Amino acid sequence: MSERALRGTRLVVTSYETDRGIDLAPRQAVEYACEKGHRFEMPFSVEAEIPPEWECKVCGAQALLVDGDGPEEKKAKPARTHWDMLMERRTREELEEVLEERLAVLRSGAMNIAVHPRDSRKSA
């Protein structure tokens, strides 16, 4: 198998066509700068939406757009609690009814609940 493999990978990668007569898409160079002072340019299409931040090519930190608005602050949603999810499914009146039903079952002794779970086991 190794004898039949092509020996030059450049044959596949290199295009021998010329760029003459080909109109490239219009581009714009956008400059970014990171906290460490690295500045670099990225080419974007004229029609593309320019991202406000980009990963620095040198150090990998977040670089911000030079002469541009900073990234938009995302509004953080308040965390949904168990109570919030419960209130989405039931009204307060329904919860009161369920509570009364469960308390009535407990008071009637219909549920066999051991005070200490260890007491309900058989001793050896």
From Swiss-Prot:
Protein origin, superkingdom: Bacteria
Gene Ontology biological-process annotations: positive regulation of DNA-templated transcription; response to antibiotic
Record note on cofactor: Bind 1 Zn(2+) per subunit.
Effect of disrupting the coding gene: Grows slowly, colonies are smaller. Not more diamide sensitive than wild-type, sporulation normal, 15-fold more sensitive to Rif.
InterPro entries: RbpA_sf (IPR038638), RNApol-bd_RbpA (IPR025182)
Family annotation (Pfam families): RbpA
Positions bound to Zn(2+): 34, 38, 56, 59
Subunit annotation: Homodimer. Forms a complex with the RNAP, and a complex with RNAP plus principal sigma factor HrdB associated with promoter. Binds to free principal sigma factors HrdB and HrdA, probably via the sigma-2 domain, but not to 6 other sigma factors tested.
Family: Belongs to the RNA polymerase-binding protein RbpA family.
Function: Binds to RNA polymerase (RNAP), stimulating transcription from principal, but not alternative sigma factor promoters. Stimulates transcription from several principal sigma factor HrdB (SigA)-dependent promoters but not from a SigR-dependent promoter. Stimulation occurs in the presence of the transcription initiation inhibitor rifampicin (Rif).
Record-given protein name: RNA polymerase-binding protein RbpA
